Amino acid sequence: MANKKILVVGSANMDLSMNMYKVPDVGETLIDDGGVAYVPGGKGANAAVALTKLGADCHFCAKVGADLHGQKLYQYYKEFGINTSYLKVDREHPTGLAVVMKESDGNNRIIVYPGANGNLTVENINEAFECEPDALYLGFEIPFAIALSAAKIAASRGIPIFVDAAPAGKDYPLESLPMVEIFSPNEKETETFTGILPQGTDSALRAALALYKRVKAKYIVIKQGERGAFVYDGKHFFVIPSIRIGKAIDTTAAGDAFTAALTVEYLRSNNIRNAVKFGVAAGAITVTRKGASASIPTDDEVRALILKEDLI
């Protein structure tokens, strides 16, 4: 089967990644030599890298600044084989920057400065659809109005839509989104959208029901980290448990890898259970490696883990 062409409309950031024993408390100054580095990131870009590594023909629509970070990101995407025909340059705003603070237990806190990401336009989106994609992959690190425009264009053309619902905003009019194939937030994003933190099966079901009332989706897939993933289709639910293959080093791109892998496998198999297992396996590998997009596994690596764990 030919590789599916997936259009990613999302963010492109340079990440300032800082490793530390713990983040400082209010009023506290810490000295920590855990290491600091600039690495490619952004949820849209991470997804584009993941989709490409997992076998998709990925076209990336995003905006970077006319600066050194933008130049480095462009070259990085080209080297990965991502189609950058719709990667635009903003000459008035810098490339987006994310400050990623990673604690020794693998957990992280992220602050994003949108920069050029906030200036992606409807015209940019319309041009990107000239690639005639098989699917649209959306994230919310760009203005919600632009994400909504992309979704409406896709819906008008009968193109399936996959939403990695991050980051979340309480005021996002989710009801205005057209029908999407999969809507996938993590636990904290689900809490922001619904007021319910899905930490167990009962609370996850209540949260999924609340989301289902707001979002027109074939499937709600809640990423639950160490608990795996919770899936609801409006009538039934199931849980795919997580896989632990080693110490969690960096969770930065785990959600991006999960949703990208879920999307690729769903488009290949049209089987939601197998697709979620594929996503869980991709996320399990990702957290054992440092970095954002650099930590994302290949299709072969994910399939090898699935065979080893007898998941499918």
Predicted regions: what they are:
Residues 48-57, 102, 264-269:
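Alpha-helix C-terminal capping segments
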Residues 135-206, 227-228:
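Conserved beta-alpha-beta core of the PfkB/ribokinase-like small-molecule kinase fold
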